[in-house]
């Protein structure tokens, strides 16, 4: 989606970072919920490290997983606050910011932080 300005401003984030985040979070989900199906021996150095974490810290991994999603919810809600502060009042743009930030966290939120709306002169 292209970027608009003012009340309907939205900018999609970097495809590179979104891919890195999606692959990482997918792997994390796999580790937490289906660790018995992971081919540890085929993952190079990541395999034994992941196996060690699963064997010794699975509860911590699971709690960290849910904490990560909770943080993403908080970031998404903060994105809505930032939208209002920056004059982004279009409900579709706000929804896009909320969803993008929920899925990709600070990779999305940093774009919204950097946005500087043009202020109109008041005479």
Swiss-Prot record:
It holds the Pfam family TMEM254. Keywords: Membrane, Transmembrane, Transmembrane helix. Signal peptide: none annotated. Its main location: membrane. InterPro entries: TMEM254. It is found in: Membrane. The chain crosses the membrane at residues 15-35, 63-83, 95-115. The keyword Transmembrane helix applies. GO terms for cellular component: membrane. It comes from the Eukaryota. It is a multi-pass membrane protein. This is Transmembrane protein 254.
């Amino acid at each position: 989606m292209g970027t608009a300005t003012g009340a309907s401003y939205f900018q999609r984030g970097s495809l590179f970072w979104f891919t890195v985040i999606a692959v990482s979070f997918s792997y994390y989900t796999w580790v937490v919920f289906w660790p018995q199906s992971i081919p540890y021996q085929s993952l190079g150095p990541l395999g034994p490290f992941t196996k060690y974490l699963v064997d010794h810290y699975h509860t911590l991994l699971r709690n960290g997983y849910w904490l990560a999603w909770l943080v993403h919810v908080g970031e998404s809600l903060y994105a809505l606050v930032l939208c209002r502060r920056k004059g982004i009042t279009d409900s579709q743009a706000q929804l896009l910011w909320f969803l993008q930030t929920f899925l990709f966290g600070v990779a999305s939120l940093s774009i919204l932080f950097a946005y500087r709306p043009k202020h109109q002169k008041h005479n």
